[in-house]
């Protein structure tokens, strides 16, 4: 640490504390403000748009300073946290009246993007995720926690940076910690990331924190179940949280392992291409996600992150959706759910010490809805719904306690009291009555003093600096009784106090202090009582979230005309009248549905041709979205859906230059294609849209053909849209390849898209007609038509030569054997003639 002896004592104290928190902003409490100094002040002034000033000089230089009022700090902190930065809160812990030198101060809390619990800092509909990455021997061990959910999840060991990136971005964390300084420096995730000191990833320390933080039985189970490197990753989260909280994270009550074999995998590019869960109004989540609670919205996002292939889980969800859909029973349930607050986060705030009085009122009001909800669920007496209902705990005792203890509209904090309801505590009521009755005493006392002095303008008042006083104008100085003691002199008046008024003041102020202390004690005791229900409330919250999502699915099924999918083990995907929900939602005319059939026995690869705007991309996307919906347990936009086991969805749709990495559009396209080719299997669904456009015609055709052939050989279910009509010939070479196209009709120089998938290859691309629709001027269109005519004429003359130049490695001169073969008409010769020709050629 640098020499700080030339600084003032207060700045010396600040610098000592700041040296322990160099990478985060230090909010340093001074009276009614949190102050920031030096570089922190400059950064905060820019981030928060607050004034940058200077506080005198220290070590001969002006000290940059910026500050925010402590009572408004929450709003400023929220801005900083949402920008991905962290803050250390440094409070005055010493008594200013007894301190010699600067008041003692300590950092009481660290606030980071993923470790906040206050409502102002959080997105109600999104989990606050902290990811830990332990890199060792070119492997990545990953664990994450949804902070306010109170759980840690362990992910399978990852063996490549690309796999790690996809896993992390799927989680969309607010914060990442790691042992790898190189990974933190590269930051391929573009998320807040920090490399921690080595001890955070010590296996010895990890086991210690697991034992200290978790229930004994859970800790023992974890230590026996997982390997050392996995334990190290789990322990890193617990040690980090302990350091952040300055306390043991007791709210973490569960550790679980995510089984990848039960998950439908979708890489981050495919998620973006399919518009699954981005923030746009056209995303699938925005159309499907109409949950009534924050609990349900967050759970639905988890479903979107981890679609399950577990058929038992899917069958359970479908059964509940059907039950809730009967007579639209979900409407009654959703009405009750709309009154339930975020009890999961409220109980976490209780455990973390950040709960506010209004949270307790919201908790009480939410728990009051549970008997109604349980009754509605019991009306659907199915095993699946009963199972959920049994995990919703009716906490009548807690409701009664909170109802008796907390006033209806409490203040924001307990700091100034006024939270506990009258009648809850006798001692508190007595202390408050002294203050409440003070007004009557002061009225009587003032009237008595007026009579005693004969001064009708005499006033009795109070201010926070001088306390209670008797105020008289200076013109009445000759009438002042001898027992009046001067307290304050003003320009036109004097203020006095008497022994009686001083005794009353001491009694009132003492009662206020005692009442506030008593109220805080009652409040703390109340929170300890509430936390006894932690596990029951967490389990109740999880069950409410589940029923909210499924009631939402039931409502969406009816509103959007969705049907229940079936699952088969026949390697067959049969879909009828499939629709694209976002497009259907955003157009005025009726959406034209399409059928899709993919089967190992008939076709696994569809070559899709047709004009731009004809419907090719929509067709492919809607199939992928349907599969995705089926695997989150929703009903699907089709009249019929029979789905086989799909373990991964890959897409190669659209592209743009990756300028920051120096990669062209074509390079991006090829990189993504290579990833798909290297990982696709017979259980994959692959969407390929117009591959090979970013290079020369024949290079593009060659690559597109080779990729299509590879997918045919793999047997992956592949929808392959292309403008290379030559690829339609693959259907003659591979029995598992078929052609479909999207029709268009021409009428009086206009084009009309049918948006209907038809068997066979397209015969025309209609590019010029599409250009006309786009608004290209008539003179350009006429020129294009002439150019097209010339090009087609030229191609007819040179096509065979060009194709040979592109694909043929041998000399173009045919040998006699080749000439003989070319002369044979295989459509007219008999089998016997063919054998004779073969025998003759063999003799040569």
From Swiss-Prot:
Q: Which GO MF terms does the UniProt record name? A: ATP binding; ATP-dependent DNA damage sensor activity; damaged DNA binding; mismatched DNA binding
Q: Name one Pfam family in it.
A: MutS_I
Q: Is the keyword DNA repair in the record?
A: yes
Q: Which InterPro entries match?
A: DNA_mismatch_repair_MutS, DNA_mismatch_repair_MutS-lik_N, DNA_mismatch_repair_MutS/MSH, DNA_mismatch_repair_MutS_C, DNA_mismatch_repair_MutS_clamp, DNA_mismatch_repair_MutS_core, DNA_mismatch_repair_MutS_N, DNA_mismatch_repair_MutS_sf
Where ATP is bound, by residue?
610-617
**Any one cellular-component term (Gene Ontology):** cytosol
PROSITE patterns, sorted = DNA_MISMATCH_REPAIR_2 (PS00486)
Query: Which UniProt keywords are given for this protein, alphabetically ordered?
Result: ATP-binding, DNA damage, DNA repair, DNA-binding, Nucleotide-binding
- What's one GO BP annotation on this UniProt entry? mismatch repair
The family assignment reads: Belongs to the DNA mismatch repair MutS family.
Spell out the PANTHER family in the cross-references.
DNA MISMATCH REPAIR PROTEIN MSH1, MITOCHONDRIAL, DNA MISMATCH REPAIR PROTEIN MUTS FAMILY MEMBER
What this chain does, per the entry, is described as: This protein is involved in the repair of mismatches in DNA. It is possible that it carries out the mismatch recognition step. This protein has a weak ATPase activity.
Name assigned to this protein: DNA mismatch repair protein MutS
Source organism of this protein record: Francisella tularensis subsp. tularensis (strain WY96-3418)
């Amino acid at each position: 640490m640098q020499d700080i002896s030339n600084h003032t004592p207060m700045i010396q104290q600040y610098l000592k504390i700041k040296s322990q928190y160099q990478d985060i902003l230090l909010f340093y409490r001074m009276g009614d403000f949190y102050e920031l100094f030096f570089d922190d002040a400059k950064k905060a002034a820019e981030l928060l748009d607050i004034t940058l000033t200077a506080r005198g000089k220290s070590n001969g230089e002006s000290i940059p300073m910026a500050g925010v009022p402590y009572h408004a700090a929450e709003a400023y902190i929220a801005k900083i946290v949402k920008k991905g930065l962290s803050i250390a809160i440094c409070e005055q812990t010493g008594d200013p009246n007894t301190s010699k030198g600067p008041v003692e101060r300590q950092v009481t809390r660290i606030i980071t993007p993923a470790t906040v619990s206050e409502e102002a800092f959080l997105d109600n509909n999104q989990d606050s995720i902290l990811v830990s990455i332990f890199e060792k021997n070119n492997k990545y061990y990953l664990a994450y926690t949804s902070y306010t959910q109170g759980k840690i999840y362990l992910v399978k060991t990852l063996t490549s940076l690309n796999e790690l990136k996809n896993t992390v971005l799927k989680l969309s964390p607010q914060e990442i910690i790691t042992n790898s300084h190189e990974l933190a420096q590269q930051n391929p995730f573009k998320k807040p990331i920090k490399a921690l000191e080595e001890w955070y990833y010590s296996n010895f320390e990890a086991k210690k924190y697991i034992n200290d933080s978790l229930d004994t039985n859970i800790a023992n189970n974890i230590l026996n179940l997982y390997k050392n490197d996995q334990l190290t990753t789990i322990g890193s989260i617990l040690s980090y949280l302990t350091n952040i909280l300055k306390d043991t994270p007791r709210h973490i009550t569960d550790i679980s392992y995510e089984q990848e074999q039960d998950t439908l995998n979708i890489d981050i590019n495919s998620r973006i291409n399919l518009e699954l869960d981005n923030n746009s109004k056209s995303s699938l989540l925005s159309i499907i996600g109409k949950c009534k609670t924050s609990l349900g919205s967050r759970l639905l996002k988890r479903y979107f992150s981890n679609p399950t292939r577990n058929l038992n889980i899917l069958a359970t969800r479908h059964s509940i959706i059907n039950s809730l859909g009967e007579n639209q029973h979900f409407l009654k349930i959703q009405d009750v759910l709309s009154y339930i607050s975020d009890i999961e986060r409220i109980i976490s705030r209780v455990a973390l010490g950040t709960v506010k009085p209004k949270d307790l009122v919201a908790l009480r009001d939410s728990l009051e809805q549970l008997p109604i909800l349980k009754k509605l669920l019991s009306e659907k007496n199915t095993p699946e719904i009963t199972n959920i209902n049994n995990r919703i705990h009716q906490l009548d005792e807690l409701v009664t306690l909170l109802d008796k203890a907390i006033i209806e509209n409490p203040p924001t904090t307990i700091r100034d009291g006024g939270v506990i309801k009258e009648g809850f505590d006798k001692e508190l009521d007595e202390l408050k009555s002294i203050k409440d009755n003070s007004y009557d005493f002061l009225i009587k006392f003032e009237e008595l003093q007026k009579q005693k002095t004969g001064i009708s303008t005499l006033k009795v008042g109070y201010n926070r600096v001088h306390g209670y006083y008797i105020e008289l104008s200076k013109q009445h100085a000759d009438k002042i009784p001898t027992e009046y003691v001067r307290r304050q002199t003003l320009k036109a008046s004097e203020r006095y106090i008497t022994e009686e008024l001083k005794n009353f003041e001491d009694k009132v102020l003492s009662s206020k202090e005692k009442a506030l202390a008593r109220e805080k004690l009652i409040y703390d005791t109340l929170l300890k009582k509430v936390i006894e229900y932690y596990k029951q409330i967490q389990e109740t919250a999880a069950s409410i979230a589940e029923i909210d999502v499924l009631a939402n699915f039931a409502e969406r099924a009816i509103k959007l005309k969705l049907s229940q999918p079936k699952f088969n083990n026949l390697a067959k995907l049969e879909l009828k009248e499939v629709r694209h929900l976002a497009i259907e939602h955003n157009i005025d005319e009726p959406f034209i549905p399409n059928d899709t059939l993919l089967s190992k026995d008939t076709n696994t690869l569809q070559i899709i041709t047709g004009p731009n705007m004809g419907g090719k991309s929509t067709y492919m996307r809607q199939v992928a979205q349907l599969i995705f919906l089926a695997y989150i347990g929703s009903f699907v936009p089709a009249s019929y859906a029979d789905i086989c086991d799909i373990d991964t969805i890959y897409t190669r749709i659209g592209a743009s230059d990756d300028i920051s990495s120096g990669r062209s559009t074509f390079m991006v396209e090829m990189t993504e294609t290579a990833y798909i080719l290297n990982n696709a299997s017979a259980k994959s669904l692959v969407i390929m849209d117009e591959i090979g456009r970013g290079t020369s015609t024949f290079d593009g055709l060659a690559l597109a053909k080779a990729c299509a052939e590879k997918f045919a050989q793999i047997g992956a279910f592949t929808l392959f849209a292309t403008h290379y009509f030559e690829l339609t010939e693959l259907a003659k070479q591979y029995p598992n390849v078929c052609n479909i196209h999207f029709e268009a009709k021409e009428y009086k120089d206009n084009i009309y898209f049918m948006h209907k998938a038809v068997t066979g290859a397209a015969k025309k691309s209609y590019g010029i007609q599409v250009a006309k629709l786009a608004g290209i001027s008539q003179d350009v269109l006429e020129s294009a038509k002439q150019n097209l005519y010339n090009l087609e004429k030229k191609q007819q003359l040179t096509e065979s030569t060009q194709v040979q130049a592109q694909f043929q490695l041998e000399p173009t001169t045919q040998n006699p054997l080749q000439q003989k073969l070319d002369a044979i008409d295989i459509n007219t010769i008999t089998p016997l003639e063919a054998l004779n020709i073969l025998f003759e050629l063999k003799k040569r």
